């Protein structure tokens, strides 16, 4: 395998800031075999952009190694997620289904991004590094006569590179569309569930206010009746008035719905932010697909012209011009993959924290 050139790190700009998330509810304590303090501390020990990048760039991006990298670097891991959900939600509900779906989609999308890194590595090692080696040898001055040996060398390199398949999927690829569609559908479901929960909270608020008014009215009626009704009749009035003035839904239901809204908001805003990241990555991959396609077209045209000392230098010249731009695009894509990892860890960790937050 040829030696591959490395990238210079770019400045990370996270797209998932704290302002995207709802204000947390008050902290409390919980008694459970599940260590809440330890889990929250571990969840927020998410690797930084530079940590992720430094670890990713040193591994051999085979499928097995990338899967191992995912299991080590994705926070929180599946075990923590399942324990948290089983602790807070004993029964399977719409909320738990949506939250579980968010965690699963974010993991699948992260695996997809790691596969893109594998494609970047393939393009670097099997296309752009051999071209760079050729550029370092081939004379830059196209006006002077080029030695036939250089043209033969370039032609042989073209023969080898012509067999290289474009590692980047076309913009019409189902894999990318399916990944994005999952997030779009999840966003719609979360939005619907949030509206439903908010509607329930408003209903509970009106019911509570109505029951308070009912209680005041009952007290007034009882006081007025006391002047005309014998003492032994008072318990009967209270027995009748009590059920009529009791809130239709207990206050704990309202707290539960508010807790649900907090969790749904974190999941919804995390979904929105990650979808934006996917859109950016999609555009980068699309440009790289076109760039590799055009480079391969130049290589094919060069081969069709044969070992000509006049045309081969022109094709090398054109490939040299596009080389800087395309290798820079590869670097930018790697930056966004590392940024994705940072953002998805932060988003998942914040949702886990909201799930484990005690209801007070």
Curated annotation (Swiss-Prot):
<dbReference type="GO" id="GO:0016020">
    <property type="term" value="C:membrane"/>
</dbReference>
<comment type="similarity">
    <text>Belongs to the UPF0496 family.</text>
</comment>
<dbReference type="Pfam" id="PF05055">
    <property type="entry name" value="DUF677"/>
</dbReference>
<feature type="transmembrane region" description="Helical">
    <location>
        <begin position="229"/>
        <end position="249"/>
    </location>
</feature>
<protein>
    <recommendedName>
        <fullName>UPF0496 protein At3g19250</fullName>
    </recommendedName>
</protein>
<keyword id="KW-0472">Membrane</keyword>
<keyword id="KW-0812">Transmembrane</keyword>
<dbReference type="InterPro" id="IPR007749">
    <property type="entry name" value="DUF677"/>
</dbReference>
<feature type="region of interest" description="Disordered">
    <location>
        <begin position="1"/>
        <end position="29"/>
    </location>
</feature>
<feature type="transmembrane region" description="Helical">
    <location>
        <begin position="205"/>
        <end position="225"/>
    </location>
</feature>
<keyword id="KW-1133">Transmembrane helix</keyword>
């Amino acid at each position: 395998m040829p030696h591959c050139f490395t990238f210079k790190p770019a400045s990370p700009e996270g797209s998932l800031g704290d302002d995207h998330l709802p204000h947390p509810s008050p902290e409390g304590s919980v008694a459970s075999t599940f260590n809440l303090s330890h889990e929250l501390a571990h969840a927020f020990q998410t690797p930084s952009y530079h940590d992720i990048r430094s670890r990713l760039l040193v591994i051999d991006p085979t499928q097995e190694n990338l899967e191992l990298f995912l299991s080590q670097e994705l926070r929180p891991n599946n075990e923590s997620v399942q324990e948290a959900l089983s602790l807070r939600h004993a029964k399977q509900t719409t909320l738990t289904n949506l939250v579980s779906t968010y965690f699963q989609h974010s993991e699948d999308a992260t695996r997809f991004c790691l596969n893109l890194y594998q494609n970047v590595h393939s393009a670097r090692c099997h296309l752009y590094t051999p071209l760079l080696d050729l550029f370092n040898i081939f004379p830059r001055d196209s006006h002077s006569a080029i030695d036939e040996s250089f043209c033969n060398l370039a032609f042989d390199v073209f023969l080898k590179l012509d067999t290289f398949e474009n590692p980047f999927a076309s913009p019409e690829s189902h894999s990318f569309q399916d990944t994005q569609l999952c997030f779009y559908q999840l966003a719609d479901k979360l939005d619907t569930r949030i509206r439903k929960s908010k509607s329930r909270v408003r209903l509970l608020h009106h019911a509570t206010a109505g029951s308070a008014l009912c209680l005041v009215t009952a007290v007034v009626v009882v006081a007025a009746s006391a002047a005309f009704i014998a003492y032994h009749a008072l318990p009967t009035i209270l027995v009748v008035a009590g059920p009529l003035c009791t809130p239709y839904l207990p206050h704990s239901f309202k707290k539960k719905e508010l807790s649900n809204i907090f969790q749904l908001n974190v999941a919804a805003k995390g979904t929105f932010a990650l979808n934006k990241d996917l859109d950016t990555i999609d555009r980068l991959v699309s440009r790289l697909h076109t760039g590799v396609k055009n480079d391969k077209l130049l290589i094919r045209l060069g081969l069709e012209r044969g070992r000509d000392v006049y045309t081969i230098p022109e094709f090398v010249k054109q490939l040299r011009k596009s080389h800087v731009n395309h290798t820079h695009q590869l670097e930018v894509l790697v930056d966004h993959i590392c940024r994705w990892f940072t953002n998805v860890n932060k988003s998942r960790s914040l949702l886990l924290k909201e799930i484990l937050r005690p209801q007070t």
